[in-house]
UniProtKB/Swiss-Prot annotation:
Pathway: Purine metabolism; AMP biosynthesis via salvage pathway; AMP from adenine: step 1/1. PANTHER family: ADENINE PHOSPHORIBOSYLTRANSFERASE. Its EC number is 2.4.2.7. The keyword Transport does not apply. This is Adenine phosphoribosyltransferase. It comes from the Bacteria. Catalyzes a salvage reaction resulting in the formation of AMP, that is energically less costly than de novo synthesis. SUPFAM superfamilies: PRTase-like. GO terms for molecular function: adenine binding; adenine phosphoribosyltransferase activity; AMP binding. It comes from Caldicellulosiruptor bescii (strain ATCC BAA-1888 / DSM 6725 / KCTC 15123 / Z-1320). GO terms for cellular component: cytoplasm. The gene is apt. It catalyses: AMP + diphosphate = 5-phospho-alpha-D-ribose 1-diphosphate + adenine. It is found in: Cytoplasm.
Amino acid sequence: MNLKEKFRHVLNFPKEGIDFIDITTVLQDKDAFKYAIDSLVNLVKDLDFELIVGPESRGFIFGAPVAYVLNKGLVLVRKKGKLPYKTVSVEYELEYGKDVLEMHIDAIKPGQKVVIIDDLLATGGTTLSNIKLVEKLGGEVVGIAYLVELTYLGGRENLKGYDVRSVVQFESSLI
């Protein structure tokens, strides 16, 4: 299956000059969704790890089924105030300000190996925040897997030193 053809490009969303890769078309197509999950499973099954970290919110969509198939635990990373128990947090930069991501303080034990799974790699900024959370708790990120990588935005360069994998790569924007 050519999964790349299954994504919808929405030009100038959420603002002028952005080529937004819409994953909903993949999710709506049962065969494409299954192929996407199977592909992510194949990307990480050779790694030695115990937990999958799924960032809010699309990391939940892809991280949960991969964790299920590979019989791994799933750790959720949420925006501030969304988790009910004590948390560890990290502040990160957005285009128009700052935001905070959190993880339960007991989600990862020191020395545990994790894989981060998310929908899309753009600049890598959000992933770096997820890595900081894992490492604050003493975990080790042994792999990072994305359904989509926008290679023209240089995210992989910003994640140097980490094992970065992706199912589909877009080499240029449609804008």
